[in-house]
Amino acid sequence: MAARGVIAPVGESLRYAEYLQPSAKRPDADVDQQRLVRSLIAVGLGVAALAFAGRYAFRIWKPLEQVITETAKKISTPSFSSYYKGGFEQKMSRREAGLILGVSPSAGKAKIRTAHRRVMILNHPDKGGSPYVAAKINEAKDLLETTTKH
């Protein structure tokens, strides 16, 4: 190993920067160090700004949480959905049969048949529909047709 101030062999000077004489050091080393310092300062300021923003958000969240929950309670969720929420009744009624087919319980046979066809095409078991739902659709059609006079 070379002593301080003595020029090292060419191979070692490329590997170990401490063996280089001060005049042989890279001229842009100070620029790189300044960039590093600037980057660290920018990162530090960014973290500080993020911390202050988070602190502000947490402070303002408590009052906003109450306002949001009150507003959510005022909005009625059933009005957003056009679908019937709930399962099937134990014994099917005319009202439920009408809901399944999408017709009035007092609809005529022609309207019931067209509605049955439309709903069955969408829910047929051969096309990936549920056999249980298909059975309920058929049951609704049978119930409405047997109780309808025209």
Curated annotation (Swiss-Prot):
GO terms for molecular function: ATPase activator activity. InterPro entries: DnaJ_domain, J_dom_sf. The modification Phosphoserine is found at S104. Residues 96-150 form the J domain. Expressed at highest levels in heart, followed by liver and kidney. Disulfide bonds: none annotated. The chain crosses the membrane at residues 36-58. It is a single-pass membrane protein. It is found in: Mitochondrion inner membrane. GO terms for cellular component: mitochondrial inner membrane; mitochondrion; PAM complex, Tim23 associated import motor; TIM23 mitochondrial import inner membrane translocase complex. Residues 59-150 are mitochondrial matrix. Residues 1-35 are mitochondrial intermembrane. SMART domains: DnaJ. The keyword Flavoprotein does not apply. Negative regulator of the mitochondrial respiratory chain. Prevents mitochondrial hyperpolarization state and restricts mitochondrial generation of ATP. Acts as an import component of the TIM23 translocase complex. Stimulates the ATPase activity of HSPA9. It is linked to Absent or down-regulated in many advanced cases of ovarian adenocarcinoma, due to hypermethylation and allelic loss. Loss of expression correlates with increased resistance to antineoplastic drugs, such as cisplatin. Interacts with the TIM23 complex. Directly interacts with PAM16/MAGMAS; this interaction counteracts DNAJC15-dependent stimulation of HSPA9 ATPase activity. Associates with complex I of the mitochondrial electron transfer chain; this interaction may interfere with the formation of supercomplexes that facilitate the transfer of electrons between complexes. This is DnaJ homolog subfamily C member 15. It comes from Homo sapiens. The lineage of its organism: Eukaryota, Metazoa, Chordata, Craniata, Vertebrata.
